[in-house]
């Protein structure tokens, strides 16, 4: 599917809010912007995801967060019941949409039967790393773009040792993200 077809698919999706749909309609005559947002998905690596906050396949938004979290949930579920009980700690920084993205991630994890410890207020990355170990969590998620400009947000993932994911887990999440994004904006795949 080319970027224009992907754009049209998103535009027609019932999963979009009215605001999201209006954002996409506003770029209808800007071919370069459509290409930038829909030429391919954000790439998931050992540090997670980072990108500008816009509606689109190649940007940080609630749909991309949900797909990445479903991939992460699959990795945790593959570790077994004990890993699911240990669960995940989730925190966020003060960037726009960080709380929304953290809650979306928490909902996907909970929907997969994985215990969630969601911080109620802003926390720095080192505190999440500590919390994962202190609470005996299987994993952690921090919604932050670190040093990147304010237009960005990110999704950092951690394993039970409080460090970034092992490469094999990151690769599994990346594979799953590609599966979910092949039917972009299909909300049924996100939870």
Annotate the PLM regions.
Residues 52-54, 100, 151-152, 166-168:
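Short helix/loop capping segments that flank catalytic or ligand/cofactor-binding pockets
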Residues 1-2:
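Polybasic, low-complexity association/targeting segments
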Residues 10-13, 83-160:
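Ferredoxin-reductase
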Residues 164-174:
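Short, acidic/small-residue loops that bind anionic groups at enzyme active sites
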Residues 180-185:
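Conserved small/polar residues in nucleotide/adenosyl-binding loops
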Residues 8-105:
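An N-terminal, well-structured beta->alpha segment
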